[in-house]
């Protein structure tokens, strides 16, 4: 009976779960309009809270995300793995866009995903009684990953390096400016890819046999 009475009014909003009506017009659910209040927030997430966790280290030898994909210049983390605040990354992106604004064809590419919800409890709070409320989004970036790429027609090398240095100045950690020809990075080691030939294969076989006989 209550729902039938409410449906008589054209200005009735049925809530978050169902569609809304305004003067007889169907509107999408309210949940699809909310994006967690930040541009880096994921579009869909399974759990609203997560454990603190640790930044993964590529101990298996993965080189994914250590080279440029779309841009001509990039900024790569080289000293340690860091959990970044979404606002820190947003500030760095705004700096890049502001410096590269005079170049019409300039573009900024992001290579990270802020999919870690961080929850915070108030100061001087007793132990227990839940994890705490959602505070901000974060991203776990392991060592050797590319964070930003920039590219475009007419971009000079000096301007690109200046923009990336200014963005790195506002982020924690140490970074290196890379180009397309920069070798991949595994932790703190640069991986130089050499073509495999008969001579290199023989040299590797001799090194392996010498080490096994010495043991």
Curated annotation (Swiss-Prot):
GO cellular component terms, A-Z: cytoplasm; mitochondrial large ribosomal subunit
Keywords noted in UniProt: Mitochondrion, Ribonucleoprotein, Ribosomal protein, Transit peptide
The keyword Lipoprotein is annotated on this UniProt entry: no
Function: Component of the mitochondrial ribosome (mitoribosome), a dedicated translation machinery responsible for the synthesis of mitochondrial genome-encoded proteins, including at least some of the essential transmembrane subunits of the mitochondrial respiratory chain. The mitoribosomes are attached to the mitochondrial inner membrane and translation products are cotranslationally integrated into the membrane.
Gene Ontology MF term list: rRNA binding; structural constituent of ribosome
Gene name linked to the record: mrpl16
Species for this entry: Schizosaccharomyces pombe (strain 972 / ATCC 24843)
Family recorded in the similarity comment: Belongs to the universal ribosomal protein uL16 family.
Subcellular localization(s) per the UniProt record: Mitochondrion
Protein name as catalogued: Large ribosomal subunit protein uL16m
Keyword Plastid annotated: no
InterPro entries for this protein: Ribosomal_uL16, Ribosomal_uL16_bact-type, Ribosomal_uL16_CS, Ribosomal_uL16_dom, Ribosomal_uL16_sf
Signal peptide start and end residues: none
Gene Ontology biological process terms, A to Z: mitochondrial translation
């Amino acid at each position: 009976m209550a729902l039938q009475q409410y449906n008589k009014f054209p200005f009735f909003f049925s809530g978050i779960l169902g569609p809304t009506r305004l003067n007889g017009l169907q509107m999408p659910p309210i949940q699809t309009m909310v994006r967690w209040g930040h541009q880096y927030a994921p579009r869909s997430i399974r759990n609203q809270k997560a454990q603190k966790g640790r930044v993964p280290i590529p101990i298996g030898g993965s080189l994914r995300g250590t080279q440029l994909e779309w841009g001509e210049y990039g900024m790569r983390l080289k000293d340690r793995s860091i959990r970044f605040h979404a606002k820190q990354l947003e500030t760095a992106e705004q700096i890049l866009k502001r410096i590269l604004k005079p170049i019409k064809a300039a573009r900024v590419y992001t290579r990270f995903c802020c999919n870690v919800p961080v929850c915070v409890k108030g100061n001087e709070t007793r132990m227990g009684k839940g994890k705490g409320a959602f505070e901000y989004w974060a991203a776990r970036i392991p060592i050797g990953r590319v964070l930003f790429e920039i590219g475009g027609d007419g971009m000079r090398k000096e301007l690109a390096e200046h923009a990336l240095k200014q963005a790195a100045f506002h982020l924690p950690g140490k970074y290196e400016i890379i180009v397309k020809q920069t070798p991949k990075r595994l932790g703190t080691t640069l991986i130089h890819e050499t073509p495999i030939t008969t001579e290199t294969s023989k040299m590797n076989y001799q090194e392996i046999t010498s080490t096994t006989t010495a043991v």
